[in-house]
C-alpha cells in the first residue's frame, strides 16, 4: 500500500437526482465536499480519491435511522474519479467494462451491476445510472496538476432491508479495461472520498475509516488514510435513499 503514481499495487489518494421509489427519502448524506477543494487549499485540502487494486476493492460503511427501526434502502449513490496526466477518459465506459455495488454486514455480496461500453455513459441496466457530476456543477478534481472529471453512479431499485442504527458495508468498483501499451495492466477504479471536518458539507456517519475487501467481497479489515499516503483520515462519499417500514 502507498501513495505512488506508477505502482500497480497501490492505494491512490485519490447532481442530478434520479427517480426514486415513492416515499424514498435521503437518509445518509455524505456527499461530495464543498470546501477546501484541491491543491489550492494547501494542507486543508478535503478531497481525495482512493483505490485498492492489489486483489480486491475498497469500501466503507453507514447506518440508516435509529435502533429499533426497520428500513428499506432504495438507492445508493457514489462517485468515481478516473484518469491521470497520461490518460483522461471521455466516458466511464472507456476505462471500465462494468460497475458493481456490493453490500452487506461483515462480508459483502453483489447486489447490483451494469455493463459499460466504450464511448458511452449508458449502462446495460436501467437501474444503474451514470452522469458526469462536473457537468452538474461539481469542481474538477486536481490530480497532481491534472484536472479530472468526477462521475456519479446511482444504483436504484435496490430494495435492501436493513435494521435501523446498524452499520452496513458497501463497495463500488468496476473491472478495468486493458491499458494500451501497458502489458498486463488494467485501469484501477478510484472512489471519491473526503475528510469530514474539512468538507464543508454534511458527512453523515463519517468515522475516518474505510474498509478493505477481497475480490469476492470478504472482509480484509480496515484502512485509515492518515499516514498511508495522506495526512488526514477520509471516508468514501456516499448518499443513501430509503423508506421506513413498520
What do the PLM-derived regions correspond to, one by one?
Residues 1-10:
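Bacterial N-terminal signal peptides that target proteins for export
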Residues 13-22:
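Hydrophobic h-region of N-terminal signal peptides that target proteins for export
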Residues 21-51, 245-246:
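Boundary/junction segments of secreted and surface-exposed precursor proteins
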Residues 52-67, 151-155:
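Short beta-strands within extracellular/lumenal beta-sheet-rich domains
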Residues 66-77, 163-167:
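Extended extracellular/luminal ectodomain segments enriched in beta-structured repeat modules
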Residues 71-90:
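A short beta-strand element within beta-rich, extracytoplasmic domains
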Residues 90-203:
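Aromatic- and Gly/Pro-enriched, solvent-exposed loop/edge beta-strand patches characteristic
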Residues 191-246:
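PGST-rich, cysteine-poor low-complexity/disordered linker and tail segments that act as flexible spacers
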Amino acid at each position: 500500500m502507498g501513495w505512488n503514481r506508477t505502482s500497480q499495487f497501490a492505494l491512490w489518494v485519490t447532481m442530478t437526482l434520479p427517480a426514486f421509489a415513492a416515499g424514498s427519502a435521503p437518509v445518509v448524506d455524505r456527499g461530495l465536499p464543498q470546501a477546501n477543494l484541491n491543491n489550492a487549499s494547501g494542507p486543508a485540502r478535503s478531497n481525495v480519491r482512493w483505490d485498492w487494486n492489489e486483489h480486491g476493492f475498497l469500501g466503507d460503511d453507514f447506518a440508516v435511522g435509529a435502533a429499533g427501526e426497520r428500513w428499506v434502502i432504495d438507492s445508493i449513490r457514489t462517485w468515481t474519479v478516473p484518469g491521470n496526466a497520461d490518460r483522461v477518459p471521455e466516458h466511464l465506459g472507456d476505462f471500465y467494462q462494468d460497475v458493481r455495488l456490493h453490500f452487506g454486514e461483515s462480508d459483502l455480496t453483489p447486489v447490483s451491476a451494469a455493463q459499460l461500453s466504450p464511448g458511452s455513459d449508458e449502462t446495460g441496466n436501467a437501474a444503474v445510472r451514470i452522469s458526469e457530476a462536473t457537468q452538474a456543477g461539481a469542481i474538477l478534481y486536481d490530480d497532481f496538476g491534472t484536472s479530472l472529471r468526477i462521475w456519479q453512479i446511482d444504483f436504484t431499485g435496490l430494495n435492501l432491508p436493513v435494521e435501523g442504527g446498524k452499520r452496513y458495508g458497501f463497495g463500488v468498483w468496476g473491472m478495468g479495461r486493458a491499458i494500451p501499451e501497458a502489458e498486463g495492466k488494467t485501469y484501477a477504479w478510484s472512489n471519491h472520498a473526503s475528510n469530514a471536518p474539512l468538507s464543508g458539507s454534511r458527512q453523515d456517519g463519517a468515522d475516518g475509516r474505510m474498509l478493505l475487501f477481497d475480490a469476492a467481497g470478504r472482509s480484509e479489515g480496515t484502512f485509515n488514510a492518515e499516514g498511508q499516503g495522506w495526512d488526514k483520515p477520509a471516508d468514501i462519499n456516499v448518499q443513501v435513499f430509503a423508506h421506513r417500514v413498520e
